[in-house]
Amino acid sequence: MIKALFFDVDGTLVSFNTHKIPESTIKALQMAHDKGVKIFTATGRPLQLLNNIPEVQHLMDGYILATGALCIYGDTTVREDFIPHNEVMAFVDYCSKNNIPTVFVGKKDIQIYNRNEMVNHVLYDMLKVTYNKYDVPLEEVIDQGILQITSFITDEQEKDILPQLPGCTSARWYPSFTDITSATADKANGIRAIAKHLGIDISETMAFGDGGNDKSMLMAAGIGVAMGNAVDDVKAHANYVTTSVDEDGIKNALMHFGVI
């Protein structure tokens, strides 16, 4: 029996085409919630940038954020996983030398380093981010502990810098940037932490995703569902492929497995 659902946000809950949550998804989550199933996001976004799910915010029991680096259930922080400080500083140096725009996500605040128009376009035009409070200096954000680095680097630059960050891993869910986290921070470990906190078995969880940073949780969950709009590599890591986010994919999968 499925007792907890975990949803990626962009491309899974929220359509990249409409930038909205389909009505069928809202109704499906409400039905699952009414049956006592716990509902969580599992997203690369930090909490400050999670502004695109207002229609279902009231249904969320908790959040897996920053690709698993921060896990919250209710008001309880279940898991925090920070990037090693020396590797954060090494990446700052790399960004400085190569003029790379990068978002540093601290425990409390966010700062954008080398901000440019491309960053503004992706965050505010493409991903519809509304957060714009970047008044805390980067040094202070780093001192809080860095949960995630979202860097607008090319694939080649990513391959160049990652060997210098042995305590980190990366995952790309949008072409323009990659999310860098602690090597032990991923959505799968986030689900494991939440399941342990809830006192349920991992086999009683179900995860939905479409992007590269979803593969680990699709394999870890009791049932891993890839959206129809996912790339083939993600689909290959899932137990089941549903229809796309715009074609009632979440509702269809929840009905298929008898969750609703």
Which functions belong to the PLM regions below?
Residues 57-60, 80-83, 119-124, 189, ...:
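Short, hinge-like loop/turn segments at secondary-structure boundaries
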Residues 56-59, 66-67, 164-167, 220-221, ...:
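Short, structured coil segments at secondary-structure junctions
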Residues 60-66, 81, 124, 170-174, ...:
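Short hydrophobic/aromatic-enriched beta-strand-loop microsegments
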Residues 36-40, 59, 145-149, 203-205, ...:
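Short active-site oxyanion
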Residues 94, 98-208, 212-217, 229:
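Conserved acidic, metal-coordinating active-site core of Asp-based
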Residues 23-118:
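Active-site phosphate-binding/coordination module
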Residues 1-4, 22, 180-260:
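Mg2+-dependent phosphoryl-transfer enzymes with acidic/Ser/Thr/Gly-rich catalytic loops
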